[in-house]
């Protein structure tokens, strides 16, 4: 494991690759960084860009960008699509049974073997036993990383999907730091899709 807890506190800006960037909720608290964000969906990428005008936003395939550009960065954050891992896959009222998305596991294995910098991969707790043991469990999220992450409090917004009310959605957007008046559920996805 790397000892990189002070990566963002050094004198120079940290070059960050934000994969599957979505609307940018994960990006809210990052400081002293130079960020390149990769988002597949142009409409979502535009919202990210509006909320983070100093970041470079790439509309494209996060997996391909990672393979080609990983060594240009000090730190990589990845939040691969969660929908096909989520417990909601089994809890839904509709018949949406599908295979889980292997991108999550591919990114973790790829970064473990082909990236020398620091990295974090985040996703929801899956409906199945994780294929790779996470380093941390934070609320409804699992974290994989190649460095120790200090424990911290993380708010856990409950029932924002199952209740589906405007009030719960607004609490969710506020928690994520998303400034967007539109529907965050776009093309069957919330926040980000390929990601």
What feature does the model see in each segment?
Residues 1-15:
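S-adenosyl-L-methionine-dependent nucleic acid methyltransferase catalytic domains
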Residues 2-6, 48, 90:
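Intrinsic low-complexity, intrinsically disordered segments enriched in polar/basic residues
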Residues 7, 65-75, 82-195:
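Class I S-adenosyl-L-methionine
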Residues 8-12, 49-55, 94-99:
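Intrinsically disordered, low-complexity coil segments
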Residues 12, 31, 53, 69-72, ...:
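Residue-level preference for short coil/turn positions at secondary-structure junctions
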Residues 16-66:
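SAM cofactor-binding core of SAM-dependent methyltransferases
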Residues 19, 38-39, 60, 78-79, ...:
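Short His-Asn-centered micro-motif
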